[in-house]
Amino acid sequence: MKRLISCLTIICALNRSAAAETTSSPCSRWISLLKPVCQRIHQTWTEGHDDMYFSGYAWHNRYTYRPEKIKSYNEAAWGGGLGKSLFDEKGNWHGLYAIAFLDSHRHIEPAVGYAYLKTASVNKDIKAGLGYSVLVTSRVDYDNVPFPGALPWVALFYKRTTVAATYIPGSAGAGNVLYILGKISL
């Protein structure tokens, strides 16, 4: 619960910080190489829709874990979070999020990040996307020390709802988890 409150506090602090910047030059103090990154994040935060995330499943790859280990893992990765997202001028999706969920050992794992998806429209209401997410998370097995990560991300959009998935790579007995989550744009 503390981690969820921490994630929500970070979002509120970012909101206050974004509001304090002038809209004409929100990224003026950034180096020129990173200004486009700052500008896209700022645009997502200020123009994006509010999102509610929910998670519920983490599949551990049966080819990399022993059956008795699989039985000991939690695959009901219940959790949720908040975010902001938008489709840009090219129709691609950008999202900022803060979530917390139960990890494989039933410990709360928070994550804060940015995701980008190159999308293709199937029809007016359905889009499919493929991209990545960069994030900061912490885990009990790493002494709750925050660490960065980058993961592949796929999604299927239907009107205001989204089903997304990422694969956490690893080695035999570590990682190799398909994590599935959903999003509703409010």
Swiss-Prot record:
Transfers a fatty acid residue from the sn-1 position of a phospholipid to the N-linked hydroxyfatty acid chain on the proximal unit of lipid A or its precursors. Confers resistance to cationic antimicrobial peptides (CAMPs). Promotes the ability of L.pneumophila to replicate and/or survive in macrophages. Important for ability to kill macrophages and to promote the virulence. Keywords: Acyltransferase, Cell outer membrane, Membrane, Signal, Transferase, Virulence. GO terms for molecular function: O-palmitoyltransferase activity. GO terms for biological process: lipid A biosynthetic process; symbiont-mediated evasion of recognition by host antimicrobial peptide. It is found in: Cell outer membrane. InterPro entries: LipidA_acyl_PagP (IPR009746), OMP/PagP_b-brl (IPR011250). The gene is pagP. Disruption phenotype: Mutant is impaired in stationary-phase survival in low-Mg(2+) medium and shows decreased resistance to different structural classes of CAMPs compared to the wild type. Mutations reduce both the numbers of bacteria recovered during intracellular infection and their cytopathic capacity for U937 macrophages. The mutant is also more defective for lung colonization of A/J mice. Residues 1-19 form the signal peptide. Pfam families: PagP. Belongs to the lipid A palmitoyltransferase family. It catalyses: a lipid A + a 1,2-diacyl-sn-glycero-3-phosphocholine = a hepta-acyl lipid A + a 2-acyl-sn-glycero-3-phosphocholine; a lipid IVA + a 1,2-diacyl-sn-glycero-3-phosphocholine = a lipid IVB + a 2-acyl-sn-glycero-3-phosphocholine; a lipid IIA + a 1,2-diacyl-sn-glycero-3-phosphocholine = a lipid IIB + a 2-acyl-sn-glycero-3-phosphocholine. One of its GO terms (cellular component) is cell outer membrane. This is Lipid A acyltransferase PagP. It comes from Legionella pneumophila. Its EC number is 2.3.1.251. The record marks 69 as: Role in lipopolysaccharide recognition. Its main location: membrane. The active site is at residues 60, 103-104. Homodimer.
